[in-house]
């Protein structure tokens, strides 16, 4: 992996199974681009491609050729990879009965460390196709999404996307990957929530347009409210709280809190940086979940004041958890601990003349037009939050120090009235 990164051989927009990358960083980048485009009055179409059993259909000869000619692997290293891929067998066993042994002629070994990496290298030529057509894209292992901002005044605005899809299908067929048209989904975003569906040619994608899609575990709606996602989180969290009530009598408070974090908090925090700037009504539903979990853990009654309970548990409220995640991504981006595609969204503030502000580690805040569009984009919201932090937090020397200082600061903001 170090060789691939140092040699700039890995796809920059492939976020699967790479250090400092995650589903969240991938979605932050994609949603940033879409929010900025719609903030500028454009429409944007997002397409989620489906590859059926992609890991199982990799052609070994093509993969070896790719490793040799695209990645530059040769000699003993290439021979070792050949021995790893070829002459593999499998059988099916049920109880004491088993099938005859059969050769595995295709696919990368699943469940292995090398499998996902080899698959991502197998997909390397896809990036050139997307770039040829000028279509932004992002990959997470075998999850592939491409999106295109466009203006209604453009001539044939969706033509680059449609031509790109044609080439992608041809490439996949040539490389023994099964492109599943029926499971491919598309969603259209407008400049505002009430935007009408534009009269543009989406060809076969028209029948696959949805008002809401699930992208890397996050439900995204065409109005960008994230209401569908929040509703799903709330429903799932309360379901698990009800289930936990059955085991609560058998767990210590410490163990119960760990279980709550595993089943409830993890859902509240998953990709929560995408929720920066959403409406208070949306966040309040998530806050109800956290409040219920806090009362469940402490045995407090439904109508007991929640703020002292959260303070005693040292649980930051939902809105502060969202800000915390965004600022953590900023700190990591500024310290080479995040994907390059996120770091590129942040620019240092350059004062017009020599001022003390040059030493404040401030970021430039791009101008935006709409509170519910541009202001929510990572490239806008993140610098605004960062610049409002006290200097000693921005000057933190490591991730643990930054997280500790930031939590202490947010704790004081969230619970400053507790105990007064």
Regions found by a protein language model. Give the residues of each.
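Hydrophobic/basic alpha-helical segments
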Residues: 1-420
């Amino acid at each position: 992996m170090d060789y691939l990164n140092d040699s700039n051989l890995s796809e920059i927009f492939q976020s699967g199974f790479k250090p400092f990358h995650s589903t969240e960083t991938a979605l932050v980048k994609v949603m940033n681009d879409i929010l900025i485009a719609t903030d500028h009055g454009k429409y944007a179409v997002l397409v989620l491609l489906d590859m059926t059993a992609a890991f199982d259909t990799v052609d070994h000869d093509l993969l070896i050729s790719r490793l040799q000619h695209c990645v530059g692997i040769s000699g003993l290293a290439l021979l070792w990879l050949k021995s790893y891929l070829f002459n593999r067998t499998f059988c099916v066993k049920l109880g004491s009965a088993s099938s005859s042994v059969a050769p595995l002629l295709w696919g990368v070994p699943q469940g292995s460390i090398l499998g996902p990496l080899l698959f991502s290298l197998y997909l390397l030529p896809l990036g050139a196709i997307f770039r040829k057509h000028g279509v932004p894209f992002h990959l997470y292992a075998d999850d592939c999404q491409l999106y295109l901002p466009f203006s209604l005044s453009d001539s044939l605005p969706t033509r680059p996307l449609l031509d790109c899809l044609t080439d992608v299908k041809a490439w996949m067929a040539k490389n023994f990957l099964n492109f599943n048209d029926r499971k491919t989904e598309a969603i259209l975003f407008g400049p505002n929530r009430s935007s009408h569906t534009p009269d543009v040619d989406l060809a076969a994608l028209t029948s696959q347009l949805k008002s809401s899609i699930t992208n890397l575990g996050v439900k995204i709606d065409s109005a960008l409210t994230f209401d569908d996602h929040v509703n799903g989180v709330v429903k799932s969290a309360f379901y698990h709280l009800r289930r936990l009530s059955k085991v609560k009598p058998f767990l210590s408070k410490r163990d119960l809190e760990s279980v709550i974090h595993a089943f409830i908090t993890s859902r509240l925090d998953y990709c929560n940086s995408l929720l920066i700037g959403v409406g208070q009504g949306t966040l309040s539903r998530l806050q109800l979940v956290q409040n219920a979990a806090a009362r469940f853990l402490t045995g407090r009654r439904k109508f007991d004041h929640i703020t002292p309970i959260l303070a005693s548990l040292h649980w930051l409220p939902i809105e502060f958890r969202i800000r915390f995640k965004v600022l953590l991504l900023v700190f990591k981006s500024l310290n080479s601990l995040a994907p390059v595609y996120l770091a590129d969204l942040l620019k240092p503030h350059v004062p017009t003349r020599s001022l003390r502000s040059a030493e404040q580690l401030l970021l430039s805040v791009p101008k935006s037009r709409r509170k519910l569009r541009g202001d929510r984009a990572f490239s806008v919201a993140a610098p605004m939050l960062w610049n409002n932090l006290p200097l000693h937090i921005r000057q933190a020397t490591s991730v643990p120090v930054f997280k500790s200082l930031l939590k202490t600061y947010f704790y004081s903001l969230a619970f400053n009235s507790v105990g007064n």
